[in-house]
Design a protein with these regions (language model features):
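Charged phosphate-binding loop/patch that engages nucleotide di/tri-phosphates or the phosphate backbone
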Residues: 136-162
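Acidic, metal-coordinating catalytic segment for phosphate/diphosphate chemistry
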Residues: 1-19
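Unchanged
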Residues: 45-68, 79-136
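A cytosolic small-molecule/anion-sensing beta-strand core signal
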Residues: 24
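A short gly/proline-enriched turn/hairpin at secondary-structure junctions
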Residues: 39-42
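C-terminal lobe/hinge of AMP-binding adenylation domains
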Residues: 33-35
């Protein structure tokens, strides 16, 4: 298995991540780790893997769902705390589409998991109406107004949480 582009030392973390924005019948699918905020589904890009290949792999691993990667709509430079260390993350966000909607529930909440640093992370996958995005915290927050606008222009944002 290829190594994720995720570098850590005692002083900082660098992360290269990709997220898939899956909207189906007026609802968006988000992931929610236990005791954390909602987030766009995705993961770390592996060495020599394209962002599209990563999204296809991540949706397969976490949801057992086949997707079609449609269009890059945002690029984020994100600075946030990773435990006690600062993290500098570069992230790309794409619109994605289910190839076969019968592969996963298309309403409500269902469960899955991810592995990060050899640790299993339990996740809830939640379908929320686009209207609900205005009233909840979703990471990264800067991306939500762009999603709600319906624009397919590439949006660049910087998020400084540290």
């Amino acid at each position: 298995m290829a190594k994720d582009i995720l570098f850590k030392n005692e002083d900082f973390v660098f992360s290269y991540r990709v997220g898939g924005i899956l909207i189906h019948e007026g609802k968006i699918l988000l992931q929610k780790p236990k005791n954390d905020d909602y987030a766009i589904i995705g993961g770390h890009i592996a060495l020599f893997e394209t962002t599209g290949e990563t999204l296809i792999r991540e949706f397969q691993e976490e949801l057992h769902a086949d997707i079609e990667v449609q269009k890059l709509i945002a690029v984020g430079e994100i600075f946030f705390p990773w435990g006690k260390r600062p993290c500098h993350q570069l992230a790309m966000y794409y619109l994605v589409k289910l190839k076969d909607p019968s592969q996963i529930p298309t309403d409500g909440v269902f469960h899955g998991y991810d592995d990060l640093d050899n640790e299993r992370i339990d996740l809830d996958f939640c379908w929320l109406s686009l209207e609900e995005l205005k009233n909840i915290k979703v990471y990264p927050e800067e991306l939500i107004p762009h999603i709600l606008s319906g624009s397919e222009e590439i949006f660049h944002f910087v998020s400084r949480q540290i």
